[in-house]
Amino acid sequence: MFTLLTLCALFAETITIYPDHHSRVFSAHEKPVAHVHSGDTVITKTWDSGGQDEKGVRHLQQPYVYPESGNPLMGPFYIEEADRDDSLEVHLDKVRLNRNWGYTSYRLSPETLGPGAAESSYKNFYKMDAVRPQRADLIPWDLDLEHKIASPRLLQKSAYRFSLPVNPMLGCIGVATAGDEILTSGPAGSYGGNMDYNDVIEGATLLFPVYHKGAYFYLGDGHALQGDGEGLGTGIETSLDVQFTVKVRKGKTLSIPRLINEDYIISIGSQPEFHSNTDYALRMANSDMLKWLTTEYHLTAPEANLLMGTVVKHKIVTYFGTVATLIPRKYLSR
């Protein structure tokens, strides 16, 4: 007998939606921009962190100021079959650049450096409002869409040829937070959020806990490129074309987000930014990985501990709150 989810997969639809409004919170109280079913595919676009779209049109009255506000999000998407204690699987079919410019802050965040290092870095030569209203700390970048190269418009240059291959990613992705709590798209947590994880790229599959009927899925904050840790406090901020497919996993309760790509399975631990060291997020990610290995890959507890102790990798996702625990998939296909 076909289950409801099997029938949804058989009659899956592709929905194209380009919202003319946004949200800045991961909340179940926001009005959905679309109702979709498990198995459906959505084609959409995201604005940059300042609210500008692929044509340079600015959709926000006020600039982003942490933590009172947040990155503009597309969503929420209401997933009809999702309910509390399920998990939501989101496969990123496409994450593509759609304009030829972006921007970053001009130097590393002082909190990422040792005492005195920030002061001896370099002064800001950039003008107020040059890139975004009420911001004087931003550098514009040129994005070569044909060759997929990013280059900063530097005022001070050396002989160094500064051009980098792009790797488009989504900084914000997740579901509505648990209970009645309403969090802006500035922090990250068990629901996802502003994780700024540079493995959230085309081809990745993400898994999120579901805390409310409908899940209320959001995405936004596109980056053309970003290093581990988001040391600048930004990636190369830009707008994106995105296509994703959703699937509900009934009764598959999760405690934190997970990510699967061609090479790794990944547990993502987040904690309130600036409130504690990243060791708490690391412990969350490690604990979830142990559970994943024993419950879904059916390793014994000794096997899971020994595998993690010998082949685990870690990523500092953001310097202020998120850490990823990675296990190579080649050790799990035996």
Predicted segments — roles?
Residues 166-279, 290:
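Conserved mixed alpha/beta catalytic, RNA-binding, or beta-rich assembly cores of soluble enzyme
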Residues 18-27, 66-73, 183-191:
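Short, structured beta-strand/loop micro-motifs enriched in basic residues and often containing a Trp
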Residues 44, 87-90, 208:
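A generic structural signal for residues embedded in beta-strands
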Residues 26, 47-61, 95-105, 214-224, ...:
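Short, Lys/Arg- and Gly-enriched loop/turn segments at beta-strand edges
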Residues 15-65:
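N-terminal, Lys/Arg-enriched amphipathic/low-complexity engagement segments
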Residues 96-198:
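Intrinsically disordered, low-complexity linker/loop segments enriched in Gly/Pro
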Residues 55-70, 74, 102-114, 219-237, ...:
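Short, compositionally biased
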